[in-house]
Amino acid sequence: MKVLVVGSGGREHAICRAVAKSSRVDKIYCAPGNAGIAALAECVPIGAMEFDKLVSFAKDNAIDFTIIGMDDPLVGGIVDEFEKAGLKCFGPKKNAAILEGSKAFSKDLMKKYNIPTAAYENFTDAKEALKYLETAKFPIVLKADGLALGKGVLICNTLEEAKEGVRTIMEDKKFGTAGNTMVVEEFMTGREVSVLSFVDGKTIKIMSSAQDHKRAGDGDTGLNTGGMGNFSPSPFYTDEVDDFCKKYIYQATVDAMAKEGRPFTGVIFFGLMLTEDGPKVLEYNARFGDPEAQVVLPRMKNDIIDVMEACVDGTLDTIDLQFEDNACVCVVLASYGYPVKYEKGFKITGFEKFDGKEDYYCYHAGTKFDADGNIVTNGGRVLGITATGATLKEARAKAYEATEWVQFDNKYMRHDIGKAIDEA
């Protein structure tokens, strides 16, 4: 069969790699793809938001199955367009992708269906928000309602910081229309854990847990980013936590969406906070995380096409989802200055060191070919250096070893990815 993957990051590279392992797939296309994905798929110069062109391409090339990696096209309704054209497409429709597309919607959903989450208020008026903050308890969290590349969340320790945050989100519109509505949420303390799942509208199957590192700098300092590294599984995601989440969060979310007339098909990413009062939902994403996909998909034993088709066909209950009893760590190599200002276009060397090594992998995120055919940097997050091992400590040591194999001029990384492994 022919498969089209939509997106251009490390997550899509991980999806393409999983698809390439499927015995059912003869040909992979990726739109727009990147320099690393080009080794596995034919990259097509169509942007992820160019729905008409993507649908035409899928029709013209007799694509059997399309996988949407990114949040923007999902929230924009790309799956609806593919389905209207009679094409099979993996991901939630527009009315279900709102689970990620609007934080106000997801908070209201959790409140209505008693899914554990932080206390909150939604605001569409900056003056009302400021008035509310006058009597609030700090620290407090401000969230832009819409998509903001994972950067629309501000933790404010004082009233002054909160006032500045309201200005940033609602008045200066730093995140554009994503800030038309703002969620003010109680600050929760505990460990953050990500859990990925496959969903077919009624059945949910949990993949594995992972732990992200959002801040740009060592010691969780600096600005929020899309994610600087990850490890899977999380040692803090215990059987007890799993039991609680299965009872009160996972199926409850799928059932809530179905009851609202928004059946969810695709991947739900649960961002959880393990608090003293038990696990609570921090956020939902309507797709694989990045770099969560890079540490979870390499551990999956199943043929990804079998699982994704079952989601689309509503037969996920027939799938026995299985994962290797191992560990995986990803360290992101970024451009110095990310997530604010950074230079691009630097030549990258050392890729050949990964050749023939099953347990090491270099996922490409912000890369492209220059006019001379060299692979150069083309984004803030450039590569995801990933390694598997029998234990988290072994996988971490191997991933950091492999970060030395690749060189480019403004290479930057965190040196403490997986520090929490030592605290487990």
Language model feature labels by segment:
Residues A20-K21, G36-A38, D60, F90, ...:
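Solvent-exposed alpha-helices and their adjacent loops that cap or buttress functional pockets
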Residues L4-V5, E100-M182, Q211, P235, ...:
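Active-site nucleotide/adenylate-binding loops and adjacent lid/helix of ATP-dependent enzymes
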